[in-house]
Every structure is written in C-alpha cells, then in structure tokens.
Amino acid sequence: MPHAKSMPLDRLAALVAQLPEFGVIVLTTPELDFGQGKFTPLKFESAKQLVKAFDEGANQLKAALQNTNERAWAQPWKLGMKGIVLFQGSRFMGYRQMFLNHLVHHRAQLGVYLRMNLIAVPAIYGPSADEMR
C-alpha cells in the first residue's frame, strides 16, 4: 500500500470502476444523498468484473451525456450525506468537481498501486513509460 492511510486497492479499484455510474446520477437526478443507500459500493470477485462494470457505466454515461441539453448544465445539483450538504451548485460544477475531478484523482491513485506492484500502467494520453519499453 502506498501509505497506511491510503484506500485499500480493492476498494479503490471498485470505486474507479463505479465512478461512471456516479456521473450518470449527476446528469440524470437533481441530487444524491449517500445516506439513502442509492449508490452502494460495488462488490466484485475479479478484475474482469471491474472492467465490465466500468465499461457498462461508461456506455451509460455516454448516453446520458448525449441526452443532456445545454439548459440542464445550469440546473442546480446537490450532494449530501444523511441530510448534510456536501456540495451544492450547478449540474456542470457537480459533474466537473464531484465526478470528473474525483475520477482523475482516483485513477492516478490506482496508477500508483499498479506501479508499486510492478504492473504495467496503461496509457492515458499517449504511451505510458511501460508501453515505450
């Protein structure tokens, strides 16, 4: 583990795999309260299940993006936990801050785990150092 306070690899991988589903929620609902149990942690038994969950979520997210009109981006969106507001702003800012920034952050953490376990890090914007060898 990168640090004792770091999220365990299995939990981190499940979170990254499930984040596209969270993006869909931001685009298709006015709010999400984690305390209501509508977004529960992904249970998995293999890396294949994680990839499948990510791919399915990414396809749903692509469809949701295509169905989101310009006016919807300005609509209010709220994230909470048992009634406590964690974020409140436009759907655009919710999507950017709560979904995109979150995905980038945890994807980078996952890359650190891969590197520390001598697993090739896949390309993001071009060939990774592992792919260039």
Predicted features by range, described:
Residues 22, 60, 71-74, 120:
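A general structural signal for well-ordered secondary-structure junctions
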Residues 1-39, 80-133:
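Short, contiguous alpha-helical
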Residues 67-83:
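Acidic catalytic patch
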Residues 25, 30-69:
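Helix-adjacent hinge/juxtasegments
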Residues 56-71, 91-93, 128-133:
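Short flexible/disordered coil segments
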